[in-house]
């Protein structure tokens, strides 16, 4: 059966960027059609990404915290793992959120078309669904088609023992020996889950550090905390994987790589994602898509075709849901006639590992590469009352200031709940705040969050919770 729909705005993809664009456009009085290949809204993030991974990370945290309490006088028995119940709980979390999105979509009178959509011209999209095709004629389009996992040619990807992040979240079993190929955020998060559930986890990373985007000192703290949990192989690459009945035999290459093949029960491939620009036939609408699949846009999120916009992973790094949401609002508002540009000073990044790593703005490495005149202030959590009371003193809070003006250029936190704390630094960077603004803000005590204010006091020279390197020297 073939249907035809005419609309003012069509949004291609219903991830965080897509549904946010659709909802914002509807709130601004526009007729909106939202096209999604999945049966539920939310895209990769909600269905097979951000949300289910955080549910499983919560399980991992409870297991690890319970074990850690033994040294503080509280001993629990060995946890009994019921994978069916864990999976069921994870699916309940997803269902609650997707159900909420479905309800909000109906309340806003956004029409959802389920199926895979492709452009057939600069004014039409053809959607192929299980119940037939739908032709959508539009005045404006927003491409929010996201990204896909990258496959490696030397990996037997058709072997069920080789999984990507989606497969890892299915939690079919807990392998005894697991290799995580890629030491980025996704790989480390899933490695954290499987380690807590009982797997021996090895991580191989081609770069000389895990999470290459973060500063080395932040990652070093993570490494030191996890050196007994993971077998980490840096500056190492996988060159071959041989599938045998009893396991996957991996050949490594690198200065510290194992000389012989190593057997694993399962391999998680987490080497990044690629944009889906070519999958939606954007070229048939006249939209320029580069060879990698990215679509170039203006600050208004316009493509080279003025009435077609693009947002999210498909327009470039960083591939983050919160970036996509803000781009979505911008595109919808521009279509409605408002003046709006996507021009953030900073976009936060968080690794929901244990400990968490979070950073925003200019990193110390980037500042040095750019020749910026900076001063770095580090507050060690070994001096934090809350961290000591929580038996988690491994962390630190780091602030990066412009040396002459004191303006906050960036910051990073490593430690428990680092991601929840990062917002203050993000706001400081976005608003152009300086160290005095942050230091004179009264932070509650005892909290981990007060470490941000204390780092600012280090720069200001007013710190009293640590020896003050800027204190006035007294005459003898």
Describe the predicted segments one by one.
Residues 3-15, 174-184:
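Beta1/beta-strand and adjacent pyrophosphate-binding region of the FAD-binding site
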Residues 10-17, 21, 26-38, 44, ...:
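Flexible, glycine-rich terminal cap/loop adjacent to redox cofactors
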Residues 10-12, 117, 136-146, 180-181, ...:
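Short hydrophobic core segments
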Residues 17-21, 44, 162, 187-190, ...:
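Short glycine/serine/threonine-rich phosphate/pyrophosphate-binding segments
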Residues 158-175, 261-335:
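FAD-site-proximal beta/loop scaffold in flavoenzymes
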């Amino acid at each position: 059966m073939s249907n035809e729909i005419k609309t003012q705005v069509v949004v291609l993809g219903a991830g965080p960027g897509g549904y946010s664009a659709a909802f914002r456009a509807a709130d601004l009085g526009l007729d909106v059609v939202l096209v999604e290949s999945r049966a539920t809204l939310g895209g990769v993030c909600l269905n097979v990404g951000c949300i289910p991974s955080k549910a499983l990370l919560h399980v991992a945290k409870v297991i690890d915290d319970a074990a850690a309490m033994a040294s503080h006088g509280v001993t629990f028995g060995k946890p009994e793992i019921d994978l069916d119940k864990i999976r069921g709980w994870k699916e309940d979390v997803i269902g609650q959120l997707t159900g909420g999105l479905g309800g909000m979509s109906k309340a806003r009178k956004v029409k959802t078309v389920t199926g895979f959509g492709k452009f057939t011209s600069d004014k039409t999209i053809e959607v192929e669904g299980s119940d037939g095709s739908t032709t959508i004629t539009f005045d404006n389009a927003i491409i929010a088609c996201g990204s896909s996992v990258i496959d490696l040619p030397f990996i037997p990807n058709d072997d069920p023992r080789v999984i990507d992040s989606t497969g890892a979240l299915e939690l079919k079993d807990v392998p005894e020996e697991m290799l995580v190929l890629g030491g980025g955020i996704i790989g480390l998060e899933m490695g954290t889950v499987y380690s807590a559930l009982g797997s021996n986890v090895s991580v191989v990373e081609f770069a000389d550090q895990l999470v290459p985007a973060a500063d080395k000192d932040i990652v070093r703290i993570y490494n030191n905390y996890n050196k007994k949990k993971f077998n980490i192989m840096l500056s190492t690459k996988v060159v071959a994987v041989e599938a045998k009945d009893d396991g996957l035999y991996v050949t490594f290459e690198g200065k510290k790589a194992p000389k012989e093949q190593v057997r694993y029960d399962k391999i998680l491939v987490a080497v990044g994602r690629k944009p889906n620009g070519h999958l939606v036939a954007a070229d048939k609408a006249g939209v320029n898509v580069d060879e990698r699949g990215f679509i170039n846009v203006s600050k208004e999120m316009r493509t080279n075709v003025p009435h077609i916009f693009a947002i999210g992973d498909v327009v470039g790094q960083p591939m983050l849901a919160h970036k996509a949401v803000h781009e979505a609002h911008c595109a919808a508002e521009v279509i409605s006639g408002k003046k709006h540009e996507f021009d953030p000073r900073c976009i936060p990044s968080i690794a929901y590992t244990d400990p968490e790593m979070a950073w925003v703005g200019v990193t110390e490495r980037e500042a040095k590469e750019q020749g910026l005149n900076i001063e770095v202030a580090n507050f060690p959590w070994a001096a934090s009352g809350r961290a000591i009371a929580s038996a988690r003193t491994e962390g630190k809070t780091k602030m990066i200031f412009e040396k002459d003006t004191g303006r906050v250029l960036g910051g990073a936190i490593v430690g428990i709940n680092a991601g929840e704390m990062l917002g203050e630094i993000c706001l400081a960077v976005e608003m152009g705040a300086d160290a005095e603004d942050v230091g004179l803000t009264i932070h509650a005590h005892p909290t981990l969050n007060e470490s941000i204010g204390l780092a600012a006091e280090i720069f200001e020279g007013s710190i009293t919770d640590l020896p003050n390197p800027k204190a006035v020297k007294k005459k003898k």
